[in-house]
A protein has these predicted regions:
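Structured core elements
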Residues: 6-7, 50, 79, 156, ...
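Short, glycine-/Ser/Thr-/acidic-enriched flexible segments
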Residues: 12, 204, 214-218, 228-229, ...
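Structured functional modules or segments
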Residues: 538-616
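N-terminal beta-alpha lobe that positions the nucleotide/phosphoryl donor
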Residues: 1-273, 278-295
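Intrinsic low-complexity, intrinsically disordered segments
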Residues: 477-503, 537-559, 565
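Residue-level signal for inorganic ion chemistry
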Residues: 46, 78, 212, 311, ...
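Catalytic cores of soluble metabolic enzymes centered on carboxylation/carboxyl-transfer
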Residues: 259, 297-532
């Protein structure tokens, strides 16, 4: 077994990996960007090293900086988590070239299956049929039009080198193609470092069912069970469950065997997920994720297996020690991804900010995997997953009711969250009766009753039990040698020396609270004085109907300006594109008129309510 592992990631997955490493007696090394210096995953690790930069390209995608941290820390292996460099074959090769163990599949397998086009070829050559599509990448919008005219509309444009719905666009006809291709290429490059895209026929009402596999270097491959991930918005999962409800046992067995067949065909080693679309009794190969999935906890809860531990053991060269007949599944588990998004009206707008309150759900059958604690900041530069709430029950209905209870207890202030939408999903007759699909949230579910900027419903529950002090803030008390009148607090102080972070705890006199508005900005959950201010926003979101002001609905970065001063525009016409939390948001004109002023440039960072353009 490895003795020290560097976790090349952040947030929830870095914390998750660190916990299993601790149970196995493996020392952990965290890496962090400038914004994450005081982040939860840094506090959870035994050591931490600075990568520098704020945006992913300068930090968590910076292979050179990560390998330097691995060298300095003496790590024996690197766990990539999910996202970032987890499906980057060049990174895996670099790790191996430095004499370290990459906790994941071999680089050549990542090359083969991480490329969604070649993965289709592997599956089809092994006799596993895929969704109707093309086995080559697309560079010209005309190719999309030809594909749609031949096989029918709508068409799914997808990133060739990544999953999770990132970079995926669905076009209903030729008029939408050019803008969608450009946007898909931009998002694919931002998320996965490569802009290649490919095409598939978009099925009308499918369910997304994926199969968890694990394989060792001795040639043993087994499937652990399936997950239904059909509750999605923007082709990204909101809720997952294990096992898939109303899936015939013969289909389950066939799907599991198909997943093993694909895994053997590519000589897979490590944990992985083979994804399928299921419709009308048939299933189609979609892609293989050569990494640990976000939703792996539901499989863990039903099988009793620790998938991270399996990853680490297989990476160390150990056999699985587990045969197919040894895998048992008990009960039902549901996971809700608690994202910092405002689901009002079904828009799911990114909502970066500081968690002024975070009360986790607890109790029988409930598990919360979080990447943040109270007082931490959810940055616009990274994924907006705050936590995952998992509920287990002896059957689906028990798990559903337990999840509703857990969501009601989860209290988060400071950012909007997806919790109100997830409560609506769990309470809907279509979900209860398994009449939903991957398109159900956006086409059927009515979220118009959710007020903008609403907080999670756990306020009463957390107030009753008392929310804990924010990590990194002071723990009130008295020092062992202090009298009652001399109130002191136990303060955690951080010091960075030569790129390595050290933490020291000491008793200091309690300081009075500043009575006015916060005169500091938060960086990685820590207050930092001297933050650069910006003008007070004119309002939140786009201006009201008829307004001449186009405003940013959230904090983000301007990545495209689509009009110029003097242009005539119509109400609803796209003015610019704002990227927040790696999602593109198009800002539109709220009236007919002429563009009088463009107040931003490409690359500018704007805050919620900032005016980006004026139309007269």
């Amino acid at each position: 077994m490895l003795k020290k592992v560097l976790i090349a990631n952040r947030g929830e997955i870095a914390v998750r990996v660190a916990r299993t490493c601790r149970e196995l007696g493996i020392a952990t090394v965290a890496v962090y960007s400038d914004l994450d210096r005081g982040a939860f995953h840094v506090r959870m690790a035994d050591e931490a090293y600075a990568l520098g930069g704020q945006q992913p390209a300068d930090s968590y995608l910076n292979t050179e900086a990560i390998m330097d941290a691995a060298r300095r820390s003496g790590a024996e292996g690197v766990h990539p988590g999910y996202g970032f460099l987890s499906e980057n074959a060049a990174f895996a090769r670099t790790v191996s070239a430095h004499g370290l163990v990459f906790v994941g599949p071999p680089p050549e397998v990542i090359d083969l299956m991480g490329d969604k086009v070649s993965a289709r070829r592997v599956a089809e050559s092994a006799g596993v049929a895929g969704v109707p599509g093309r086995s080559e990448t697309v560079t010209d919008p005309a190719q999309v039009v030809a594909f749609g005219d031949e096989l029918g509309w709508p068409v799914a444009i997808k990133a060739a080198h990544g999953g999770g719905g990132r970079g995926m666009k669905v076009v209903a006809g030729p008029d939408e193609v050019a803008a969608a291709v450009e946007s898909a290429q931009r998002e694919a490059l931002a998320w996965f470092g490569r802009p290649e895209i490919y095409l598939e026929r978009y099925l009308a009402w499918p369910r997304h069912v994926e199969m968890q596999v694990v394989a060792d270097s001795q040639g043993n491959v087994i499937w652990l069970g399936e997950r239904d991930c059909s509750v999605q918005r923007r082709y990204q999962k909101l809720l997952e469950e294990c096992p898939a409800p109303d899936l015939p046992e013969e289909v389950r067995q066939a799907m599991g065997q198909a997943a093993v067949t694909v895994s053997r065909a590519c000589a897979y080693v490590s944990t992985g997920t083979v994804e399928f679309l299921y419709q009308d009794g048939d299933f189609y190969f979609l892609e293989m994720n050569t990494r640990l999935q976000v939703e792996h906890p539901v499989t863990e809860e039903v099988t009793g297996l620790d998938l991270v531990a399996l990853q680490l053991r297989v990476a160390a060269g150990e056999p699985l020690g587990l045969a197919q007949e040894d895998v048992t599944r008990r009960g039902h588990a549901i996971e809700c991804r608690i994202n910092a998004e405002d689901p009002a009206g079904g828009r799911f707008q990114p909502s970066p900010g500081t968690l002024t309150r975070f009360h986790r759900a607890d109790g029988p059958g409930v598990r919360t995997d979080a990447g943040y604690e109270q007082g931490d900041t959810v940055s616009q530069y990274y994924d907006n997953l705050v936590a995952k709430v998992v509920a287990w029950g002896p059957d689906r209905e028990a798990a559903r009711r337990r999840m509703l209870r857990a969501l009601g207890e989860t209290g988060i202030d400071g950012v909007s969250t997806t919790i109100p939408a997830q409560i609506a999903v769990l309470s809907h007759p279509d979900f209860i009766g398994v009449r939903h699909s991957t398109r159900w949230v956006e086409e059927t579910l009515d979220l118009s009753g959710i007020a903008p900027g609403g907080t999670s419903p756990g306020a009463t529950a957390s107030a009753a039990v008392g929310a804990p002090n924010a990590p990194g803030d002071s723990s009130v008390g008295t020092s062992p040698d202090a009298g009652d009148a001399d109130e002191r607090v136990l303060q955690e102080v951080q010091a960075e020396v030569d790129g390595r972070l050290y933490q020291v705890r000491l008793w200091v006199p309690r300081l009075p609270e500043w009575p006015g508005p916060a005169a500091a900005e938060r960086v990685g959950g820590r207050r930092q004085a001297g933050g650069r201010g910006r003008p007070a926003p004119a309002g939140r979101g786009e201006g009201p109907a008829g307004s001449g002001q186009v405003t940013a609905p959230m904090q983000g970065t301007i990545i495209q300006i689509l009009v110029a001063s003097g242009d005539s525009v119509q109400m609803g016409q796209a003015v610019c594109v704002l990227e927040a939390m790696k999602m593109e948001n198009t800002l539109t004109a709220q009236r007919d008129g002429t563009v009088a002023e463009i107040r931003v440039s490409v690359g500018d960072t704007v805050g919620a309510g900032d005016v980006v353009a004026v139309i007269e």
